[in-house]
């Protein structure tokens, strides 16, 4: 192989360095305030949610404009109950309004506004579902997942029960 051919080969080491530099640069110049108005509420399998941060690698490597890329951050409203699913722990939920309970691996955990709910990291993940005590007044919370921890635990999302208001969209 001549020098000219080698110069056209992909240089993964240089791509790593460039990627790390881009991450660092974005941490200095990226968006640090994410406005709720720009993010719609969406009915998904777990309930009514509004995403604030979503990693680029989960969304087709779209360009990221925020200072952080390694987090999933979303708000959720729970009227009666959420869907039920299992995934690796490392999830942090801060309850803003209301009260209720969660069933986490068969154990009932009661919570109210101002509480922090932590889903532990366990082999095989954590099965959980959330319930509102007063269906006339929705529970509101914000949840945080650090994707490095989530992926380190080889997380797999397994939906066990869908939220009753979720409707599957036809595939195109």
Outline where the language-model segments fall.
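Short, Lys/Arg- and Gly-enriched loop/turn segments at beta-strand edges
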Residues: 125-131
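A generic structural motif
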Residues: 103, 131-133
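Short, conserved beta-strand element in jelly-roll/cupin
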Residues: 73-78, 86-102, 144-147
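Short loop/beta submotifs within extracellular cysteine-rich repeat domains
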Residues: 102-103, 152
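Conserved short histidine dyad/triad with adjacent acidic residue
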Residues: 54-59, 71-87, 120-125
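A short, N-terminal "cap"/entry segment at the start of jelly-roll beta-barrel domains
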Residues: 1-68, 156-172
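A short hydrophobic beta-strand segment most commonly corresponding to one strand
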Residues: 93-94, 118-119, 134-154
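Short acidic-glycine-tyrosine-enriched beta hairpin
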Residues: 94, 106-123
